[in-house]
Amino acid sequence: ARIDQDFLDRHEVGLIFGNDSTAEATMHGLDKFREFKDTSACGSGAIFQSMNSTVTMSLACIFKLRGINLTTSAACASGSHSVGLASLLIRDGLQDCIVCGGAQEANMYSVASFDGIQAFSLREDEPTKACRPFDRDRDGLVPGGGAATVILESYEHAVKRGAPILAEVVG
């Protein structure tokens, strides 16, 4: 996107990121509380580990972003919702440029929850047949974590700064 820290320092760039479940570190903090029967055993940083907004808070601090800072949480669609919301804010002229996407870790707690409702594919020994979301014969999900980021900006803003335009959000 040809965006460097100097650009971020000079412009009001926003950040909208999606994620939807608790980090493993939070669960370990709760284990300490249970063991010692004392909330101070969780540590002063526990609050930041337990909030979904920690991803956007951390990224905004690291990159010194001054625009909108928002976390979306809508299960597996959290990252997609961040892109949709960013495009609306840009379309309505409320932001020129927004970093958006999603991040989700896979940990034993989130995986166990899905396994508990028998949501996973039974074809784990056949990976090419396991994840087929639009297939009539699908039989479940494949667990995993990951992250993706896109930079959305108005057409005028992108042209003005000479950005390579790779795609357009329409609809």
What are the functions of these language-model segments?
Residues 125-171:
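Condensing-enzyme catalytic core mediating Claisen C-C bond formation in acyl metabolism
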